[in-house]
Amino acid sequence: GTGNISSGLIESSKEPINLNADSNEWFKLNPDQTGFYRVNYQPNDLSKLEEAIQDGDLNGKDRLGLQGDAYALCRAGYSSVSSFLSLSRAYSKETEAPVLSELASGLRGIENLIEGSEFHNRYIEFCRSIFKNIAENSGWDKKESEGHLQALLRSTALSNLGHYGDEDTLHQASAKFSL
């Protein structure tokens, strides 16, 4: 999106920033991910960004950066895993392969930590819900004018659905590839 752009020097590792923003509107720090820093949003602000992702208001660089920051911050203990997972839900209509690939990597990282726990089955269902719509929109077969990134988007969605045990995907793959 477009909006007000401000710049300043952050002189410490933790420095609050006062924004003159409408409290009902979303804002994105580090637009296009040009800075080498992570942004840890307050829960209310992250919720507004989730809506912006779902509404298609953020470009691919910003969608990639948001989920990358959220995952890195939860891994480092600066934010909760539930914060990253809540943001992840907003990517169920993702259209760009690099964004989906990075998200899939983060989701797999969390799965590795909870595998065998009482939460694992619900987590698998949650992950399937993210990839299902993307796979349905991408289909199984290459389209005539499709580029390599669209093929990568499709393969990322389908392979993750297979990994997370989606029955429809497993049956289709079995029939398609005579397994």
State the predicted function of each range.
Residues G1-L179:
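Non-catalytic accessory/interaction domains
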